[in-house]
């Protein structure tokens, strides 16, 4: 089985099959999730200093911050051409 990767902005990629959720960072529960991940050293900031527009929750407990809108990431995830393949 080939691994598939998803571009989450500025050349950063994550493993597509390990994504649990792609959500907006605006709600209080998501802000708490991000803060808890930061406290447990499980936060990956892929924004390059830009505004966080999406929070990606991974199956291993890591939380990834992305500067790309959640809808755009979901569209890339559903569009097979936007996934890079390794293997």
Swiss-Prot record:
Protein family according to the UniProt entry: Belongs to the RemA family.
Pfam family of the protein (one): RemA-like
PANTHER family named among the record's database cross-references: REGULATORY PROTEIN SSL2874-RELATED, REGULATORY PROTEIN TM_1690-RELATED
Superkingdom to which the source organism belongs: Bacteria
InterPro entries documented for this protein: RemA-like
Lineage, highest ranks first: Bacteria, Bacillati, Bacillota, Bacilli, Bacillales
Organism: Bacillus anthracis
Disulfide bond sites: none
Protein name, as recorded: Putative regulatory protein BA_4010/GBAA_4010/BAS3723
């Amino acid at each position: 089985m080939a691994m598939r990767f998803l571009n989450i902005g500025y050349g950063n990629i994550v493993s597509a099959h390990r994504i649990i959720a792609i959500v907006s960072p605006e709600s209080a529960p998501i802000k708490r999730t991000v803060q808890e991940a930061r406290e447990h050293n499980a936060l990956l900031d892929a924004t390059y200093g830009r505004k966080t527009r999406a929070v990606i929750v991974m199956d291993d407990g890591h939380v990834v911050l992305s500067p790309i809108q959640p809808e755009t990431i979901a569209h890339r995830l559903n569009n097979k051409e936007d996934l890079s393949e390794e293997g």
